[in-house]
């Protein structure tokens, strides 16, 4: 079994527009299941796979930091926010792997994102840099997956956490987390309609949103 190190890391990237309890609970449950001490949240600066975020990168980074300020097991990276150009996951993971050559890296990804994973920039190389922890059980016929992704799943799927921890990277693990039906788009809609999204995200984040006047209807 791969020996555990203090550099082992669970990773969650996203626009976090805004960050909410769905993000935080998923990464915390994966962190505990993998018995990894640290998790890193990485707000995207210029996400290449979706339209521009509603809040600018400075605000999204600030909200992410506020959300985990009192939780020392979480760190927040500003790499993608500070970097010029598109926020390609493979570039961020390459930098992380250079810093932590022997560590177990486990990137959390939702089922919807996994079904489009073969469209990501250099997606196959990503699997050489990190494990993928897909937060959901596969509920589709494998034949419906794109051929390249189906082959990757066949070659790299891990059945359990112990199998994943044998190596620093390269496994795809499906892991069920608490299903919190929270979406950033719904939170934005509530705010634009002058309704409160309290209890969907940390109070401190909501206070920041109110103070900065974010997500208000035009």
UniProtKB/Swiss-Prot annotation:
* UniProt keyword annotations, A-Z: ATP-binding, NAD, Nucleotide-binding, Nucleotidyltransferase, Pyridine nucleotide biosynthesis, Transferase
Top-rank taxon, per record: Bacteria
Q: Which GO terms describe its biological process?
A: NAD biosynthetic process
InterPro entries membership: Cyt_trans-like, NadD/NMNAT, Rossmann-like_a/b/a_fold
> Which reaction(s) are listed as its catalytic activity?
nicotinate beta-D-ribonucleotide + ATP + H(+) = deamido-NAD(+) + diphosphate
* Record's keyword annotation contains Nucleotide-binding: yes
Q: Which residues cross the membrane?
A: none
- State its Enzyme Commission number(s): 2.7.7.18
Under which pathway is this protein filed? Cofactor biosynthesis; NAD(+) biosynthesis; deamido-NAD(+) from nicotinate D-ribonucleotide: step 1/1
Return the Pfam families for the record.
Answer: CTP_transf_like
Does Transcription regulation show up as a keyword for this record? no
One MF term from GO for this chain? ATP binding
Q: What family does the Swiss-Prot or TrEMBL record give for this protein? A: Belongs to the NadD family.
NCBIfam families, A to Z: cyt_tran_rel (TIGR00125), nicotinate (nicotinamide) nucleotide adenylyltransferase (TIGR00482), PRK00071.1-1 (NF000839), PRK00071.1-3 (NF000840)
Protein function: Catalyzes the reversible adenylation of nicotinate mononucleotide (NaMN) to nicotinic acid adenine dinucleotide (NaAD).
**HAMAP family, alphabetically?**
NaMN_adenylyltr
- Name by which UniProt lists this protein: Probable nicotinate-nucleotide adenylyltransferase
């Amino acid at each position: 079994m791969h020996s555990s190190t203090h550099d082992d890391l669970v990773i969650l990237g996203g626009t976090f527009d805004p960050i909410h309890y769905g993000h935080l609970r998923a990464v915390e449950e994966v962190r505990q299941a993998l018995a990894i001490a640290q998790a890193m949240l990485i707000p995207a600066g210029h996400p290449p796979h979706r339209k521009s975020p509603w809040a600018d990168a400075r605000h999204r980074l600030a909200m992410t930091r506020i959300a985990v300020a009192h939780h020392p097991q979480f760190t927040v990276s500003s790499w993608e926010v500070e970097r010029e150009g598109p926020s390609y996951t493979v570039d961020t993971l390459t930098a992380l792997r250079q810093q932590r050559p022997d560590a177990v890296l486990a990137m959390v990804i939702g089922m919807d994102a996994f079904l489009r994973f073969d469209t990501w920039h250099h997606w196959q190389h990503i699997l050489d840099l990190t494990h993928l922890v897909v937060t959901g059980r596969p509920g589709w016929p494998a034949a419906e997956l794109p051929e390249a992704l189906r082959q990757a799943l066949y070659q790299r799927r891990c059945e359990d956490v112990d199998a994943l921890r044998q190596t620093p990277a390269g496994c795809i693990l499906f892991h069920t987390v608490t299903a919190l039906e929270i979406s950033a788009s719904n939170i934005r809609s509530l705010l634009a309609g002058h309704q409160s999204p309290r209890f969907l995200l940390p109070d401190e984040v909501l206070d920041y949103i109110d103070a900065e006047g974010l997500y208000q209807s035009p």
